Structures are given as C-alpha cells and as structure tokens.
C-alpha cells in the first residue's frame, strides 16, 4: 500500500501508462497529460478553486469537463477520479511519473552534462552519443548545466548513472594520493 504522495502518484501514473499501452494510445495520453501539467503549472490556484467547498459539484464538474475537453476518455476519468479523491494536487507528479514509465519503455534517458563553460549543439550531440554507447540508451535527452567550479571536463548524470570527468574531481583524487 502506498504511504506517501509520491508513491500514490506513481500508482496512478503506472495505471494510466498500462491502460494507454493496452489501448495503443500512449502518445496521445502523453500529450494530454503534458497539456494538463502546463495548465496546472500556469494556474497554481486551480486545484484550490476546484477543491473548495464554496464551489458546488455542478460547477466543479463543469470546470473539469472544460479542462479535459478533447482529452481521451481515460484522461477525463483520471481527472474526475483525482478530483473525487481530493488528489488533483498530485497531477504534476503523476505526469512526471508517467514520463518516467514512458522513457523506460522507449529507452530514453535524461542526462545533465555539467561543464565549466556552455557547450554548443555539436558537442552536446557527441556527448549524448558517448553516453548512449556506454549505457545502451536508445535516445539521450541532454541538457547542459554550467558550473565554473568544476574547472574543466564534464560530469554526466542521469537518474542511475554518474560519469565524473571533471578536473575538480581529478585534482581532488591527485591531492588525496599525494597527501594520503
């Protein structure tokens, strides 16, 4: 049984991912969820308004129907279920967990490349290719984070892998060897 909100969100995400996989509409579900996430992020008071006791159920249902117009029946039902269980506040976490399931199923890995200076697209593409070859990922989404304190080199980090080729780490290791 789920004990924390992240676990609860993960259960919803897994259920909607499995359902959309069975129905063959994972891409549509993903787009619908991304759209909802944007709405929730751009309107932080939406959950408070919809969950308020000051709003009657007819108005609440109308807002939720308007929100999910054009979305699949599964997404419409998910939003209604979340509202019924007072869990609309979990929607953005559900979308994040859904993306994790989607990425795992498609061999997609999100990686942060930390460098001392910003890298151009050519270098980022080369780093993505190197990371993919070392980890077996089918596709790598690489973002560049600039941190001058690493001095030089690169640190590649995904959810499960860390490759530290920074000069800062190399210098620290040399220092430890010399002093140790």
From Swiss-Prot:
Purpose: F(1)F(0) ATP synthase produces ATP from ADP in the presence of a proton or sodium gradient. F-type ATPases consist of two structural domains, F(1) containing the extramembraneous catalytic core and F(0) containing the membrane proton channel, linked together by a central stalk and a peripheral stalk. During catalysis, ATP synthesis in the catalytic domain of F(1) is coupled via a rotary mechanism of the central stalk subunits to proton translocation. This protein is part of the stalk that links CF(0) to CF(1). It either transmits conformational changes from CF(0) to CF(1) or is implicated in proton conduction.
This protein's name: ATP synthase subunit delta
Subunit structure: F-type ATPases have 2 components, F(1) - the catalytic core - and F(0) - the membrane proton channel. F(1) has five subunits: alpha(3), beta(3), gamma(1), delta(1), epsilon(1). F(0) has three main subunits: a(1), b(2) and c(10-14). The alpha and beta chains form an alternating ring which encloses part of the gamma chain. F(1) is attached to F(0) by a central stalk formed by the gamma and epsilon chains, while a peripheral stalk is formed by the delta and b chains.
Gene Ontology cellular-component annotations: plasma membrane; proton-transporting ATP synthase complex
InterPro entries assigned: ATP_synth_OSCP/delta_N_sf (IPR026015), ATPase_OSCP/dsu (IPR000711)
Keyword Cell membrane included in the entry's annotation: yes
PANTHER family: ATP SYNTHASE DELTA CHAIN (PTHR11910)
Keywords annotated in UniProt: ATP synthesis, Cell membrane, CF(1), Hydrogen ion transport, Ion transport, Membrane, Transport
Membrane topology: Peripheral membrane protein
Domain of life: Bacteria
Native organism: Leuconostoc citreum (strain KM20)
Record Gene3D superfamilies: N-terminal domain of the delta subunit of the F1F0-ATP synthase
Subcellular location: Cell membrane
Keyword hit for Zinc: no
Family: Belongs to the ATPase delta chain family.
GO MF annotations in UniProt: proton-transporting ATP synthase activity, rotational mechanism
């Amino acid at each position: 049984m789920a004990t924390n909100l992240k676990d609860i969100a993960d259960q919803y995400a897994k259920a909607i991912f499995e359902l959309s996989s069975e129905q063959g509409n994972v891409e549509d579900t993903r787009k619908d969820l991304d759209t909802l996430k944007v709405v929730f992020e751009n309107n932080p008071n939406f959950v408070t308004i919809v969950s308020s006791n000051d709003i009657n159920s007819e108005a609440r249902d109308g807002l939720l129907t308007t929100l999910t117009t054009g979305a699949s029946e599964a997404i419409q039902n998910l939003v209604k279920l979340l509202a019924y269980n007072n869990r609309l506040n979990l929607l953005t976490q559900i979308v994040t967990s859904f993306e994790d399931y989607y990425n795992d199923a498609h061999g997609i890995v999100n990686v942060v490349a930390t460098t001392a200076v910003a890298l151009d697209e050519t270098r980022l593409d080369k780093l993505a290719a190197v990371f993919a070859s070392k980890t077996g990922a089918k596709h790598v989404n690489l973002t560049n984070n600039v941190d001058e304190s690493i001095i030089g080199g690169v640190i590649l980090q995904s959810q499960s892998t860390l490759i530290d080729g920074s000069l800062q780490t190399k210098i620290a290791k040399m220092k430890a060897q010399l002093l140790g």
